[in-house]
Structure formats: C-alpha cells, structure tokens
C-alpha cells in the first residue's frame, strides 16, 4: 500500500501515525530550541517525548535498535488507538502547561500533539482497527527483520 492509498483509506490511526511523525520532528526541534529559556523543564520533557514517540510510531526501530526488555514492554503498551490517544493527551497537556511559565514555541508542539491525540481518539471511537503505515515499518515489515 502506497502512502497515497493509506491516506485514502480514511483510517484515523494512519492520520494519527503520520501526525505523530510530525510530532517527533517538532518536539525534537522545539525541545532543543527552548533548552536555554525559562521553560527549560518543559523543553527537556518535549525533547524526551520525541524519543518515546519515535519508538511508538516507527515499530521497525524496536527491532534494529538495542533496547532493554523493560523499555520494549513499555513501548508495546501503546498498540491500541485508545492507549496512543492517552499518551498523546498526556504529552500535550504537559506542553500546554508550559504556557503557565510564559509563551514559547512549545505551543506548536502542544497543538500538534493534541491533533494526533484527536486522530487516535477518533479511530477508537469509530471502532477502526489500528493500522500502522507500511512506510514506517508497520504491517509485517518489522516482523520480516530477524
């Protein structure tokens, strides 16, 4: 299935997964950009969350990166739409709370994390089965690597 066919499938989990990839890039970039500002604690959380999201959204990395069994079992908890929605809600709430300290570019990360949470929640509410993108290593690609 090509990327265009995946987007035409109208499966909200695909939309959530690709929005999650955008979250990886934004959280990494904005975490570094805000590291020397008054929102340093929130930028560190944003930076750390980018690494968690990359392992959740790109299952191929769990196969090729040497990680502990504890970390693997933690990441494997997020296999359903509802669990991923919950993860993104928690991560977005943390970034929304950064506005208490003051306005910063972490707002962009909070918005995109919220959008991803909405996509996964819609997939769960409409009872769509979780469908991982083949481009990102889902649907049998990760199982082919031994």
Swiss-Prot record:
InterPro entries: TVP18/Ca-channel_flower. It comes from Ajellomyces capsulatus (strain NAm1 / WU24) (Darling's disease fungus). Belongs to the TVP18 family. It is a multi-pass membrane protein. GO terms for cellular component: Golgi membrane. Glycans are attached at residue 11. This is Golgi apparatus membrane protein TVP18. It is found in: Golgi apparatus membrane. Its main location: Golgi. PANTHER family: CALCIUM CHANNEL FLOWER HOMOLOG. Golgi membrane protein involved in vesicular trafficking. Pfam families: Cg6151-P. The chain crosses the membrane at residues 13-35, 39-61, 82-101, 106-125. Keywords: Glycoprotein, Golgi apparatus, Membrane, Transmembrane, Transmembrane helix. One of its GO terms (biological process) is vesicle-mediated transport. It comes from the Eukaryota.
């Amino acid at each position: 299935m090509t990327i265009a066919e995946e987007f035409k499938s109208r499966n909200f989990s695909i939309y959530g997964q690709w929005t999650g990839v955008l979250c990886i890039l934004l959280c990494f970039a904005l975490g570094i950009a805000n590291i020397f500002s008054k929102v340093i604690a929130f930028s560190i959380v944003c930076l750390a969350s980018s690494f968690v999201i990359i392992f959740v959204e790109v299952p191929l990395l769990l196969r090729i990166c040497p990680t502990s069994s504890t970390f693997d079992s933690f990441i494997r908890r997020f296999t359903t739409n509802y669990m991923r929605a919950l993860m993104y809600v928690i991560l977005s709430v943390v970034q929304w709370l950064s506005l208490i300290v003051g306005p910063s570019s972490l707002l962009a990360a909070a918005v995109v994390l919220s959008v991803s949470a909405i996509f996964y929640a819609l997939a769960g509410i409409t009872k769509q089965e979780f469908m991982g993108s083949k481009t990102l290593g889902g649907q049998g690609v990760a199982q082919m690597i031994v």
